Amino acid sequence: MTDKSKESGSGKLLYCSFCGKSQHEVRKLIAGPSVYICDECVDLCNDIIREEIKDVLPKKESEALPTPKQIREHLDDYVIGQDYAKKVLAVAVYNHYKRLRNGDTTSEGVELGKSNILLIGPTGSGKTLLAETLARFLDVPFTMADATTLTEAGYVGEDVENIIQKLLQKCDYDVAKAERGIVYIDEIDKISRKAENPSITRDVSGEGVQQALLKLIEGTVASVPPQGGRKHPQQEFLQVDTSKILFICGGAFAGLDKVIEQRVATGTGIGFGAEVRSKNETKTVGELFTQVEPEDLVKYGLIPEFIGRLPVTTTLTELDEEALIQILCEPKNALTKQYAALFELEDAELEFREDALRAIAKKAMERKTGARGLRSILESVLLETMYELPSATDVSKVVIDESVINGESEPLLIYSNADNQAAGAE
């Protein structure tokens, strides 16, 4: 091989055989048998090969699958409470990926079935966060779908196969990657049958969607148009095997507690023989959810076939005040840590006092929005401060106490050039 400096002695102008640039337009021109390549094309080739190796080479199978204990420990870092749900999810997810790694059939010829998951719990209890955290930890594609937007094929709304299309989009239409993914279908309780008895009128967003989801969740080869767009006969479809995809369905199931209570209630007779129960015996929604049975879900409006496709059912409890305070402070990406990091970018420290955290938790409890309501409370409390802080000078610390949360006072600003004075005012 020679470079352009050796060839230029002949006086002949040389060009790169790939991009056509002359030897004067590039730093280096490398010669081969009757061909030349410039340094820019070499760099481009290196980039292409590097990208292809990164995308094509699978992860080493020797990499150990995280054990249920390790999965649970990781969930503990991001999700507060819900210990039973974490344990159930850890075991179900571990078994699912162990099945994928070792094939559907054991050495004895036993076929391993797929165990999709149903999460039942009040709003803001951590259903979505659990699914997202699992997918991130396992480094698999993840997508969310809203069951309320789904309709039967042929009606206005989203087709159930759009769920698989979203998953493919997340992994650049790599079918093999998508088949290892996790799909979380939220608001699954909203597609319950409108009446317990089947109606003669079509229920395109309720029972119809459940019927459409059956095969997708159980395992079928879904035909998905590449790069989105509507289906048409001349189009080639991507074939995705959904039997390898883990489906997690979640919903608040408002009113399910009444169905369970009706079933478990004893002494419902009338007259002198009736058993009188005191108010103290009344169970909370979370306690009733733990006693859920398939028959309760059928009565609620899910069809038996659909419930059968979700064999792993776990419930999440309502978050109490102490749990909400922990959520504000303890997880790796806790809200107080997020806002503190934002303030740090403005060279200011953000401090929440203990009474402030309790007041925030109390407000969220009153709103009955669970952990989801915490961010909106903090946003409204810190709005003025976040608006003024970038323009202010010498603010070294912002202190939030209970009176600020209750709207009785403004956040305390401590200035770096008047520390003693600010401390005295405090």
From Swiss-Prot:
Where's the ClpX-type ZB domain? 4-57
Q: Which residues bind Zn(2+)?
A: C16, C19, C38, C41
Q: What InterPro entries does this protein's entry cite?
A: AAA+_ATPase, ATP-dep_Clp_protease_ClpX, ATPase_AAA_core, Clp_ATPase_C, Clp_protease_ATP-bd_su_ClpX, ClpX_bact, P-loop_NTPase, Znf_CppX_C4
Instruction: Report any Pfam family annotated for this entry.
Output: ClpB_D2-small
A molecular function annotated in GO for this UniProt entry is: protein dimerization activity
Q: Which family does it belong to?
A: Belongs to the ClpX chaperone family.
This protein is called ATP-dependent Clp protease ATP-binding subunit ClpX
What gene name does this entry carry? clpX
